[in-house]
From Swiss-Prot:
Organism per entry: Chloroflexus aggregans (strain MD-66 / DSM 9485)
Protein name, UniProt field: Small ribosomal subunit protein uS8
InterPro entries: Ribosomal_uS8, Ribosomal_uS8_sf
Highest rank taxon of the organism: Bacteria
Taxonomic lineage of the native organism: Bacteria, Bacillati, Chloroflexota, Chloroflexia, Chloroflexales
SUPFAM superfamilies: Ribosomal protein S8
Gene: rpsH
Listed PANTHER family: 40S RIBOSOMAL PROTEIN S15A (PTHR11758)
Quaternary structure, from the entry: Part of the 30S ribosomal subunit. Contacts proteins S5 and S12.
Any Pfam family the entry gives: Ribosomal_S8
Length: 133
């Protein structure tokens, strides 16, 4: 199946798995998806992720979701910002704050895929990929 927006597909799979209270979700892997999963793990939104290379022509990524003690998902919401039909770019000074700083913006910058506070410290702007809260 051809997917026009692989990042949007990744976010939708994570959102649906959280709503269904699944423990893991798998999807085709790419460098961008692995970088996003790494940021989500560092920021505490997911428990872990693994890249699976089982000899097929493509790799898959398995994300272990994180839940609170009362079984509420750690990820309350995900929103794709920059889409293939409408790219959204921001300067360093205009990096958006999500939910008053409780959420996270993920940006694709010249220095790689970074969280909003990392991009601020690195003094770079870039394409706003998504918001997570």
């Amino acid at each position: 199946m051809s997917v026009n927006d692989p990042i949007g597909d990744m976010l939708t799979r994570i959102r649906n798995a959280c709503m269904a209270r699944h423990t893991t979700v798998t999807m085709p892997a790419s460098k961008m998806k692995i970088a996003i999963a790494d940021i989500l793990k560092r920021e505490g939104f997911i428990r872990d992720y693994t890249v699976i290379d089982d000899g097929k022509p493509y790799k898959t990524i398995s994300i272990t979701l994180k839940y609170m003690p009362d079984r509420r998902p750690a990820i309350t919401g995900l929103r794709r910002v920059s889409k293939p039909g409408l790219r959204v770019y921001t300067k360093r000074a205009d990096i958006p704050r999500v939910r008053g700083g409780l959420g996270l913006s993920i940006l694709s910058t010249p220095k790689g895929v970074l969280a909003d506070h990392e991009a601020w410290r690195a003094r770079v702007g870039g394409e706003v990929l998504c918001y997570v809260w």
